[in-house]
Amino acid sequence: VNWRRTIGAGLNYLLHFRDNFGGGSTITQQLIKNLTGDNDTSVKRKLREAMRALELEKNYEKDDILEMYLNTIYFGQNAYGVKQAAKTYFNKELSELTLAECAALAGTVKNPFGYDLKRFPEANAQRREVVLKRMVDCGNLSEEARQAALKEDVQAWRDTGEDTGDSSDDQYQSYFTDAVIRQVLADLQSELGYSKNMALQLLYSGGLKIVTTVDPDIQAKMDAVFQDEENFPGGLGSDGTYPQASMVLMDPYTGHVKALYGGRGEKEGDLVLNRATQTYRSPGSAIKPITVYSPGLEYGVITPISVVDDAPKDFTVRGNGEGWPYNENRKYSGQTTILTGIAKSLNTVAVDVLTRVGTQRSYDWATKNLGLTTLVESLDKTQKDGTVRTYSDIDISPLSMGSLTRGVSVLEMTAAYSAFVNDGQYTTPVLYTKVYDSDGNVLIDNQPVTTLAMSTKTRDYMI
């Protein structure tokens, strides 16, 4: 532990006498931070880190600590640990790297993005020169060896996807792989108690085997459809952006996600926004079977042949004399069966039924029975004028017409609808089933959970 630097960093944090003082961490302290994920910016954290470092140095030799450090640091391109970095940048084992390639990796550590060999080869080359010169200055390298390394043409390896079965792009991993990585990373932390950094290191450098649920043939077909721009409208939307799309295909009986795609067109990077799992949108009328008609049937409020009045009820809501709710085509048929209301997606019928079901029962049904986790019970938002407004999805409009506060994901909507197919049983969607460690032991057994969401009678009516 460098007490002078540590104390100096602490004083600088309190007094702010320099903007570029640095963190004052030794390699041991940085290793502690990587292992614990303790990144709090405070004097207390620095002292806690220093004491942990002292304890670590009592039990391990310096070379062991350096090895652990090299196995945990980030090298960019989602590579944690020098072994994974060697695979990522050069598709080689660590022992196979040349001196120049080692210098390229060592140079990346200071700025994993800015010195990324794949993204910025020229910047990495400049940094590589600094590393080699420093090795000479420290007596670890001869000038002759440095000159030879400088002449070497260092090229990053590019994954063509030929050995991976990943058809989404020649360079980037698939949206499905992205989703699995995110889920396994989250589960390593929530189920096994790993810090984020420890989970990342284990995921990328720990030799894990992950059994996924993907069907390569189905995924390849989905990829081809989404990557063909002829399948999408050509112009910009009213907000100046291109219309987007995403898709999830799930086995309703097992919960296994067989394929997914997270956005229009070819994928443009690893771990980019996945609109199938990470984006929440108001579903509009697609919410009606989940929040209106299935609970209405289950609670005996309606039958498929029940008759309701297809007409606006309230002429004061909009303030322009037009009744509410209104159908999209502004046409009304008077006495109408539930079946017709569903077939034509009539807002008037949906509001009528939801009023009888009750908004709280509808909300509970969607969240507890059919797995919609992002519906909002109550949320305060500060408006532009400084006032605070409370939003809630436990209301007529959100639950009957899908204008939700946060929205829902395509993945959760897919799982909710699957209950109508699976005899009224809701099954949690899964992207992988097992994670094995490098010795073949099961780390995570991720089996889907199936619960009875509705009676078979309701299910039969809905189908």
PLM feature segments, named:
Residues 154, 161-169, 374-440:
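Active-site-proximal helix/loop microenvironment
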Residues 243-244, 268-290, 304-307, 398:
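Short active-site loop at a secondary-structure junction
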Residues 13-41, 162-169, 302-362, 396-399, ...:
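Conserved catalytic neighborhood of penicillin-recognizing serine enzymes
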Residues 98, 200, 216-251, 340-342, ...:
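Beta-lactamase-like hydrolase cores
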Residues 1, 135, 222, 255, ...:
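Active-site SXXK
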Residues 212-235, 247-249, 260, 266-279, ...:
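A penicillin-recognizing enzyme superfamily signal
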Residues 19-216, 220, 384-388, 398-402, ...:
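Non-catalytic, structured segments within soluble enzyme domains
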Residues 2-5, 80-82, 142-145, 297-317, ...:
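Short, well-structured active-site flanking segments
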